[in-house]
Amino acid sequence: TYNELEKIEKPGKAKHVAIGNGKIVTLYLDREAASEEEAIPATVEVFEQKDEDLTNPLHSFTVNTIEPNNGKNVVAVKDNQIYVCRGAAGLYVYDMEGNEQWHYQMPNPINQEGNYKALANGCYVGDKYVYIAYGSYGLVVLDKTTHKVVARRAVVKSANYVVEHKGYIYVAYGKNRLQVFQLKNADPETSYEK
């Protein structure tokens, strides 16, 4: 059994939580949604991990919007950078105080009907690369330093979550499958010991 230790109310959906660099980072919507497609501002809060106190953030900052608001919206923390999957807007990277460092959005993100083609759902950050599960656009691997695309793999289903381990890239797709890739024609990831 589990004992509830703490419950912290937020004005809108709690979207994701990540731990890294001695910090706990949370993402939540600033208000309740009227519809799932609505773009809603969100807040990122940064807490000291050692304190385990989620009521008193060291820093908090507003993220312009999360659209649609019913997406995965994974957050990752590495090298004192916060990576936020903002759905239609792509992946945004901030420092711990909330200053935007860079962002990636797929090319030509809007279709002829005026709708977004794909959503940045999940991300994983290694020592050398940033991996994005970019919905129907597929898996995108970016060089962490130059922010350039190193590889991209589109498949039929929507890429939702991604993790890299020992040179293998694991992607969870929305409709019943896990797919494993290995990066070729590029330097290997350095986030593991050989």
Q: What does each model-identified segment do?
A:
Residues 31-32, 42, 88-91, 136-139, ...:
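Loop/turn residues immediately N-terminal
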Residues 41-48:
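Beta-propeller blade signature
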Residues 3-9, 56-66, 100-114, 148-153, ...:
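A short beta-strand motif characteristic of beta-propeller blades
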Residues 157-194:
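Blade-level signature of beta-propeller repeat domains, shared across WD40, Kelch, NHL, RCC1
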Residues 114-141:
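Loop/turn-rich, solvent-exposed surfaces of beta-rich toroidal or solenoidal domains
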Residues 1-3, 48-53, 95-99, 143-147, ...:
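Short loop/turn segments that connect beta-strands within beta-propeller blades
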Residues 24-26, 81-84, 129-132, 168-171:
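Conserved beta-propeller blade signature
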